[in-house]
Every structure is written in C-alpha cells, then in structure tokens.
Amino acid sequence: MRVGPSYQSTTRRRESLRLCCRIVGTPVEAARPTKSDFSATAAFFDLDKTLIARSSTLAFGRPFYRHGLLSRTDMIRGALAQARYRLSGADHRQMEKLRASACAACRGWPADRVTEIVSRYLKDLILPYVYAEARALLSEHRSAGQDVIIVSTSGEEVVAPIGALLGAESVIATRMRIANGHYTGEMECYAYGEEKAVQVRRLAAERGYLLPGCYAYSDSITDLPLLEAVGNPRVVNPDRALRRIATARGWPVLSFSTAERNSAQPMGIEAP
C-alpha cells in the first residue's frame, strides 16, 4: 500500500507505541461463514461504522460533558469531528487529529469516573446503533464455533464494555496511560493502521489461530493491513478507496444499513 505524507508524519510516533497493546477478554452467501471454514480460526471486526453506525468514542461526548469531563470547546470540536466522520470517514490525517484531540481532552480525568460513566450510558448510546446485519453476522460466527474479536482504534475503556455487550471473546483497542488513578494524556498503545495487523498476528500466534482461515471486517482504507492479514477479508459500507481495492481484489462487499435509530445527529447536538 502506498504511504502518503500524512501517514509518514506519524509513523515514528506509532512505532514507539508498538507491541504494548494487550488483549482484553470479555465474558463472552459468499461472505457468510460455514462450519467447514473453521479450524482454530477467528473473526476480527472493526467497530465504528462496521458493527455500529457511529463513532464509539464520540458517542460519549454528551455524558462526559454533563459530568464535567469535557468543556464546551471540547464539545464543539467533537461535534465538528463527528460531522466530518459521518460525511467522509476517517483517513490517516483525520485519525491523527482525533488522536491528538483525545489525548489533550482526557488529561487529568479520573479513570474510575470514566469507567462509571461508560457503564451507566453504554446501552443507551451503543445498542440503538448496532447494525442488525452485524448482530446476525456475529451470531453466525459464534454458532460456527469461531472466536469473535473486536479490533478498534477507540479506547479500551469504551471498547471492552462494548465487546462484552456484543458477546465478543476479546478486544484489541487503544490504551491510554493511567498514573495515580488519572489519565496522563499519553498513549501506551495506539491500535491503528498497521498496528492492528501486528496485534492480530500476535494474538493468532498466542491462541493458535490459522490466519488463512480467519475473517476480518472493516469499512475503512486505514484498516487495509488488518484485512490483508487474514485469508477472508470482507468490507462493510466501505469508503471509496477501500471499495476500489475490494473490487479489484474480488473481496466481498457487504452493505449494513439497519440500525434501530438514525445516528445523523453529531455529538453534543442531540436533544437531552
């Protein structure tokens, strides 16, 4: 894959975060899995715009604001980011802006308070946005005896509870550094781009998954390394760049559209 300037400018930063992600376990037609496909394999799912019709991180903006963790300025920035995300997805440049913004915003947050807020609002903010097609696909993979793993750039404190809610076996997610019970504003692991593929290969080696038989699902060109790491890549509501690659390579293209609620309203704008 050709690496553009915006990607190159952040490569060193991501290299310094490499190999420090941890796997978080949770209680757990052509594109559809069958029992004959599986022998020590797993299905790896991106989260935002693949399993759910919104950004899992930006979804919690309003409760974080209500409970004093975000300022009004943070909310305005979040609303603009949400609008851009819905219109055009997230390329490397956009993801770097979101990374920097998230690090700055969470500096000094009490970790236990974040956990409490996420737990309190999780079902209301996430369940209505789960694609019905994604829920059925998760069930099919589990019924076929395959582990379901969520691989997301969103924070572990958000992704792990969502994984538990959706019945995922484990999650791979970005992890923020916590010292003395508070977020420092620094990342210990940035689960993005090539790093997703690194962590998937690491998990496969630990658990004995046979990657040529594994599945991966994503909507974004930034997850091309993840999709290329397995033998059965599938793209879901893909952005234009990923759709072009999927078409050229003959990868199945899935269309998920059925969620319980329209997610058009940006973070902080919906009615109370």
Language-model features: where?
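C-terminal cap/substrate-recognition subdomain and adjoining C-terminal extension
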Residues: R13-S16, C20-T34, F38-A40, E116, ...
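A metal-dependent, Asp-based hydrolase signature
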Residues: S56-T57, L69-E140
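Active-site neighborhood of HAD-like aspartate-dependent phosphohydrolases
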Residues: A30-A90
